[in-house]
Amino acid sequence: MGKIVKKQELVRTGIDALDLVGRAGEVLTYVFYDIDNDKIRNRVASICKDYGLERIQFSGFIGYLSRNRREELAVKLRDAISSSTGKILIQPVCEKDFRQYREFINVEEGEE
């Protein structure tokens, strides 16, 4: 494994960080999960993708959803983990707060 080099510059900020364009009535929504079972974890990721969410971490997605779509998603995700232990967080975020978004990344030397 290569040497970890901490990048000092800000990698992505605010709305420019993700190519997301919301429509009327839609709110940025984070989905994060912690699920032990690989099959169920993959199913949860697939459901998030089906709802047009973009993966931002191994177990995290973001995208614009209406209130109804968020509720539908919540039901599907709840049902998906019903036979396993796990935890799912669905968090709407207003644009004003999302503009405060900051992301820093450490990379291995030579991966830039």
Annotate each predicted stretch with a short phrase.
Residues 1-30, 35-112:
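Basic nucleic-acid-binding interfaces
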